[in-house]
Amino acid sequence: MASPLRFDGRVVLVTGAGGGLGRAYALAFAERGALVVVNDLGGDFKGVGKGSSAADKVVEEIRRRGGKAVANYDSVEAGEKLVKTALDTFGRIDVVVNNAGILRDRSFSRISDEDWDIIQRVHLRGSFQVTRAAWDHMKKQNYGRIIMTASASGIYGNFGQANYSAAKLGLLGLANTLVIEGRKNNIHCNTIAPNAGSRMTETVMPEDLVEALKPEYVAPLVLWLCHESCEENGGLFEVGAGWIGKLRWERTLGAIVRKRNQPMTPEAVRDNWVKICDFSNASKPKSIQESTGGIIEVLHKIDSEGISQNHTGQVASADASGFAGVVGHKLPSFSSSYTELQCIMYALGVGASVKNPKDLKFVYEGSADFSCLPTFGVIVAQKSLMSGGLAEVPGLSINFAKVLHGEQYLELYKPLPRSGELKCEAVIADILDKGSGIVIVMDVYSYSGKELICYNQFSVFVVGSGGFGGKRTSEKLKAAVAVPSRPPDAVLRDTTSLNQAALYRLSGDSNPLHIDPSFASIAGFEKPILHGLCTFGFSARHVLQQFADNDVSRFKAIKVRFAKPVYPGQTLQTEMWKEGNRIHFQTKVQETGDIVISNAYVDLVPTSGVSAQTPSEGGALQSALVFGEIGRRLKDVGREVVKKVNAVFEWHITKNGNVAAKWTIDLKNGSGEVYQGPAKGSADTTITISDEDFMEVVLGKLNPQNAFFSGRLKARGNIMLSQKLQMILKDYAKL
């Protein structure tokens, strides 16, 4: 059984703790080692009167049981005084439970100004005042847990409680924003809607129901949400009588009710009402970004359905003939010089690491095969979008605050030099009318002398400039391609650093959106977002690693569509499908499941002979029989072995010096699994050994450690895990 949850040394402030729920919270926290501030004004359930006896009785009860507590008798509107009591007595504040409340129930028409105001002051303003007083202290100590107390009345409404309902749902809105602002400082805020008997509810509930809904049936949820090991943040929970349920927002898929070059009408709303209100296949947005985001994907959908922006009498920003003069316009040529240092800086910015030995060629100029990552070719060309660039094109007026990077194509004609100077020539290839904006398609060619090294195509969306009657598609635009519908052939993951955007911007993209919290907030994001081209670089590196063994000479081209933003610190998961020399892929944020790069692919230069990344079926290899036997043996004892080993081993079996087959022994997930092919996720240890030497190890003729030190067995990753190989091969590989 797991150890009990303790709060030793934590300082907990509970408001309205003189009775009911607050008393139950205070006693429960104190029983588990917390230092408790028991706040209660001492008035009745209507907020009339005051006194010290209620808080004093709870403090005395805690002390009798061996706990530590102090009383506070101030109104929650004096939040600073409550927090000062905690600081003066115990020196810190870790947990705030906003529980204090009163009732002034009246039918709506009978609510007086006083009835309305006092409810807002105690419930909403009081919680604000107390939490604000504690906030900076929690930020400085990089820790805090906050509970807001809402109500079923606030969530669903209740007759006679308009004032109470408004305040209670307001607390949920307050909590939702505190979640966003407190996340970086490890401050969690959750909201509960309790059903419990108290001096407030005893006037509206039958006596036997009040008795059944004991506060002690709510307190355990509050304690769990306030414990340092609880990762829940931003949740809304109904709780009572020993039952707990979590709530979330749900939104219909809705309907688009406007058509190309036609006004939007109330009749169109009426005619689509059933679809607008249909919760089949509903979405469940978890943030304002999810609610309003995904604009590029939406615009592509609008484009494919032939739907345009709604004109309301405003003149379009330009006409087709005006933009026609822009198409074909050549921007001034420019040079991009770079050294090995810039190549290394870029590689680090897109996640290359010395933790992966095969990445050394990208981060160490002294490596025998030092190479520049292929996607650095975008860095070479991006100056065409900055430093004047598009802003100086005659006839093209752009508000760069409304520019979104929609798609990117890069093609290499030979590997990028490890250093040098490339001359770049840019041209406006086309302009498309997407109704609610325009898409500018720009081609950039980069030369070393007269030799073409790489070609970029930038597709940027400018919000609010469309509707001029121009064409919606272009044969010049490199097409994005949907990924296959089958499960991916390979998946790689990398967790980005909190400093990822700060590091990547050193490669030349200095947009403050990616570093300045204030600028990001103005743009509608809770914090600075990662560069889309940084995610692009991570994804391309995953494909190169998985299917080309980091051989940059095999990289031919890449096309991506940017779908959603990524926040530094999130985990990027690249899902890949191999079809010939084309690797389809999409990239997700592992924590949310959001697709951030979609309809993407990498084209590889074909190779002759056996491919190191696409192993044969392993025919005529003795090792295939052994792996099959290990798989059969693990079916009965897999879970026990997983507990002992807790690792994923990827095997590269060679024949005549070439990789002839790959196998994975997954002893980390579920009941274990053995399958042919690379690890579905990331392997903890990758082992390369010949088919003959593998059989020698299995038969006990060759010790794995001796094989490693003699060079006959090569391991990368966590090589200490290879010590467990003897147990695996000895016990489960007997033929």
UniProtKB/Swiss-Prot annotation:
Please give an example of a GO cellular component term from this record: peroxisome
The family database entries (CDD domains) matched by this protein are listed as: HDE_HSD, hydroxyacyl-CoA-like_DH_SDR_c-like
Q: Domain of life of the organism in this record?
A: Eukaryota
Q: Residues in the active site?
A: 164
Quote the record's binding site residues for NAD(+).
Answer: 16-40, 75-76, 99, 164-168, 196-199
| Disulphide bridges | none
- Residue positions, PTM N6-succinyllysine: 46, 57, 68, 84, 275, 355, 423, 578, 662, 724
Name the reaction it catalyses.
a (3R)-3-hydroxyacyl-CoA + NAD(+) = a 3-oxoacyl-CoA + NADH + H(+); (24R,25R)-3alpha,7alpha,12alpha,24-tetrahydroxy-5beta-cholestan-26-oyl-CoA = (24E)-3alpha,7alpha,12alpha-trihydroxy-5beta-cholest-24-en-26-oyl-CoA + H2O; a (3R)-3-hydroxyacyl-CoA = a (2E)-enoyl-CoA + H2O; (2E)-octenoyl-CoA + H2O = (3R)-hydroxyoctanoyl-CoA
Q: Which UniProt keywords apply?
A: Acetylation, Fatty acid metabolism, Isomerase, Lipid metabolism, Lyase, NAD, Oxidoreductase, Peroxisome, Phosphoprotein
Q: Which Pfam families match?
A: adh_short, MaoC_dehydratas, MFE-2_hydrat-2_N, SCP2
SCP2 domain ranges (all copies): 623-735
InterPro entries given in the database record: HotDog_dom_sf (IPR029069), MaoC-like_dom (IPR002539), MFE-2_N (IPR054357), NAD(P)-bd_dom_sf (IPR036291), Peroxisomal_Beta-Oxidation (IPR051687), SCP2_sterol-bd_dom (IPR003033), SCP2_sterol-bd_dom_sf (IPR036527), SDR_fam (IPR002347)
Q: Which GO terms describe its biological process?
A: androgen metabolic process; cholesterol metabolic process; estrogen metabolic process; fatty acid beta-oxidation; medium-chain fatty-acyl-CoA metabolic process; response to steroid hormone; response to xenobiotic stimulus; Sertoli cell development
Chain positions found as N6-acetyllysine: 46, 564, 668
EC number(s) per UniProt?
Answer: 1.1.1.n12, 4.2.1.107, 4.2.1.119
Report the locations given in the UniProt record. Peroxisome
**Any GO MF annotation of the entry:** isomerase activity
Subunit notes for this chain?
A: Homodimer.
Task: Give any extra note attached to this record.
Answer: The protein is found both as a full-length peptide and in a cleaved version.
According to its UniProt entry, the function of this protein is described as: Bifunctional enzyme acting on the peroxisomal fatty acid beta-oxidation pathway. Catalyzes two of the four reactions in fatty acid degradation: hydration of 2-enoyl-CoA (trans-2-enoyl-CoA) to produce (3R)-3-hydroxyacyl-CoA, and dehydrogenation of (3R)-3-hydroxyacyl-CoA to produce 3-ketoacyl-CoA (3-oxoacyl-CoA), which is further metabolized by SCPx. Can use straight-chain and branched-chain fatty acids, as well as bile acid intermediates as substrates.
Instruction: Give the family, as the similarity comment puts it.
Output: Belongs to the short-chain dehydrogenases/reductases (SDR) family.
Q: What is the protein's given name? A: Peroxisomal multifunctional enzyme type 2
Tell me which species this is from: Rattus norvegicus (Rat)
